Amino acid sequence: MPVLKGKELRIVGFLCNWCSYGGADTAGVARAGQPTDLRIIRVPCSGRVDPLFVLRALLNGADGVLVSGCHPRDCHYAAGNFYARRRLEVLKQFLPVLGIDGDRFAYTWVSASEGQKWQQVVTKFTERIHKLGPAPRIEDAEPLLRLADMALKPLRPLGAGQDAPLEELKAAIKEKLPELDCVIGWQQGYDAAHAAPLFMRTPEDVDKLTWGPFNTPNPATYLPSYKGKKVGVVVKGCDSRSVVELLQENLINRDDVTIFGMPCRGTLDMARVDAALGDYRAIDNVASTGDAVVVTADGKEHRFPLSEYAQGKCRTCVTPAAVQADVRVGAPEPFTPPSETATPPELALLDSMSLPERLSFWRGHMERCLRCYACRNACPMCVCRDFCVAESRDPHWLTQDDSVREKLFFQTIHALHLAGRCTGCGECQRACPVGIPILALRQQIARAVGTLFDGYAAGMQADATPPLLGYEVEEKNIHERDWK
C-alpha cells in the first residue's frame, strides 16, 4: 500500500520478536496491503520496551510510536507484557503534560497468527498519525514563561508551627541517642530563614536542632547512605512518606531506623519570600505569629501569611503528621482528608493550557535549565547516583548537548524513574537554582498512577507494593483498544 497521503511520516514500531513481529511477517507473506510509514524495531519482549525508548523517539522527531507484543497470558517470558501494560499506560497519560498528543503513541497485542489484525492496527494507527500531521518539535515552539497561581485555597489551615514542642523533641532524641550512630534533623543555616541538615551524634549537637517554617529540606534523602547503621531521622508528614517509600523498596532497614515525627502546619517558599523581600543584606530574625511568619531583614519587619507564601506542596498536603513514627512529639493538626484530591498549583496551570502552550512552556523553562542535576541530588528516591543515566555511556542515553530537547529528556527520565515512587516532597523543585516547576512532571505521573491503580499514593503504606513493580492479570482500569 502506498503512503496514505502526501509526505511519508516517521512512525516507529517496537515489535515483540515472538508474536507481533511474526504477525507482521504473516501479513507480509499474505501480501496484505499496509502503509509504508512504519519503521520496525524488533525487540525480545514488549516488557523490554522502556518507556524512555518511546519518549526518545518522540522527542527526536518521530511523528508516532507503536508498541506491540504478545497477548496477556501468552508472553514467552511469563509476565513481560503484564509489566509493559502498566508502564505504557502510565506513559500514555504522562505525554500530554509535555505538550505531546497522547494519540501519537499506542500499544497493542498481536499474535504471530493474526496477520489480518496487524494490518488493521498499522493501517488505523498510520491514518491517525496522518490526521494529526507532523509532530511539533520543542525546538520550534515559542518560549512561554508563566507562573502558577499560588493563591489556591489550601486543603487545611496553614500555620507556622509555632507551638511545636521543640524542647520535648530534643529530650526524646537525647534519650534515644546512645542507641544510634546519628540522628538527622535541621539546624540554622547562614541565617534564620535558611535551614541546613544537622547530623546529631552528641547531646551538644542536639541543642543545635531547630524547628519552624523554613525546615524545608527532606532529611530522608540521606538515609540510604546510612544503610546498615543505626540512625534516627526527624520528619514532617511529607518527609515521612519518603521514609516509608524507602522502606517499601528495601533501600533502608526498618530495624535500623528510628523515626521522630513532628506535626507540621506548612513551610514557607523561600524563593517567593526572597522575591518579596527584594534586595537585603541580612535576615536578622524570624518569628511566628499565629498563621504568619515575621521576617526581620536589615532591621525592617515583613509579614508573610502562610496561606499566601506556603510552598505549593503544602497547599495539597494530606499528611500534616508523620505517616509512620516510632516517637511522636506534639499533637498533630486536626485534619480530615477531602473526598477529592486537589490539583497542585503548577499542575493546575498546565491543565489550563493547550498542547502547543505546554510545549512552549517547557521550551521556555528548559532554556533556563543549567543541567546542574541539583534536582536529582536532592531527591530522596533517586538512589542510583553511582550509575545515573546522566553520566552513563553504555547505554548512552544522554548527550552533553546544551539543547532544550536533551534537558527535557533528562527531566522525563527522572520523572518516569519515579513513577509510582514519588512522594511529592518537592525537593527537586526547591533545589532548582533557577526555579523551574519540574515537580509538575512528577505530579502528573502520580495523578496517572492514582487514577489507574485505585488511588494509590506513594509512601503511605510500608507493606504495599509500588504499582509498577507488580501487575494484575486482569487490570481494572486498563483496557485493550479496539482497532476495527
Regions found by a protein language model. Give the residues of each.
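Iron-sulfur-associated redox domains of electron-transfer enzymes in respiratory
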Residues: 1-362
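Short cysteine clusters
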Residues: 16-19, 65, 70, 75, ...
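Internal, well-ordered alpha-helical scaffold/interface segments
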Residues: 55, 360-363, 367-373, 377
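Ferredoxin-type iron-sulfur electron-transfer modules in oxidoreductases and energy-metabolism complexes
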Residues: 95-97, 338-367, 381-484
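Glycine-centered loop/turn positions within well-structured domains
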Residues: 241, 377, 439
